[in-house]
From Swiss-Prot:
Gene behind this protein: rpsE
Protein purpose: With S4 and S12 plays an important role in translational accuracy. Located at the back of the 30S subunit body where it stabilizes the conformation of the head with respect to the body.
UniProt keyword Ribosomal protein present: yes
Organism (species): Parasynechococcus marenigrum (strain WH8102)
Name the UniProt record assigns to this protein: Small ribosomal subunit protein uS5
Quaternary structure and partners: Part of the 30S ribosomal subunit. Contacts proteins S4 and S8.
Domain of life: Bacteria
């Protein structure tokens, strides 16, 4: 009578039949884990993009002037565009930037980037005005700004008005003296805003109390 039971192989490795199944299980687990990691990375990327979009949406930009300029080089004249851009969040931060490029869009983009590099923080009162009178100068341009009562509005013109509005100032009086150049006027307004101090800061610098400032 023949024995129908399977013959044992002396050279067989114990558990060798389970190795492919175990390897396949590990691969499936890695694929599932990798998928979860990739989904997590994608979600994190979306959240980061959303935050950046919200941060960028707070800022407004206005083009004050676009001019075609030329530069004399060895081969002749090289034409390009220059854009003056004012950037602000209407919450007390504003900047003026200048960008040059071979096309208008590129010049505006560079102007926006330059404006965000030169931001000025403006102290605002509860009536969205400025705390004190201030005077700024740039080149031959001079700008005088003074606080105004609620309901007055922004009494200014040109690039000065753009700077004040994007800074978030709602009630102010401004006077331009000297040059009419938009860039000089905008920069003079920026100088005037950068010199502003709150009453608390002024009292601390002078070494007196707030009551003496208000009196």
């Amino acid at each position: 009578m023949t024995d129908s039971s399977p013959q044992s192989n002396p050279n067989a490795v114990p558990g060798a039949a389970d190795v492919p199944a175990a390897a396949e299980g590990q691969q499936q687990e890695q694929r599932r884990g990798g998928g979860r990691g990739e989904r997590g990375d994608r979600r994190g990327g979306r959240r980061g993009d959303r935050r950046n979009q919200e941060r960028d949406s707070e800022w407004q930009e206005r083009v004050v002037q676009i001019r075609r300029v030329s530069k004399t080089v060895k081969g002749g004249k090289k034409m390009s565009f220059r854009a003056i851009v004012v950037v602000g969040n209407e919450k007390g931060q504003v900047g003026v930037g200048v960008g040059k490029a071979g096309d208008v869009i590129g010049a505006v983009r560079k102007g926006v980037a330059d404006g965000k590099k030169h931001l000025v923080k403006v102290p605002l009162t509860r009536h969205n005005s400025i705390p004190t009178l201030s005077n700024g100068r740039d080149g031959a341009a001079s700008v005088l700004i003074r606080p105004a009562a609620p309901g007055t509005g922004v009494i200014a013109g040109g690039s000065i008005r753009t700077v004040l509005e994007l800074a978030g100032i709602k009630n102010v009086l401004a006077k331009r003296l000297g040059s009419k150049t938009p860039l000089n006027n905008a920069r003079a307004a920026m100088v005037a805003l950068s010199l502003l101090r709150t009453h608390k800061e002024t009292a601390k610098e002078r070494g007196i109390s707030l009551e003496q400032i208000y009196s």
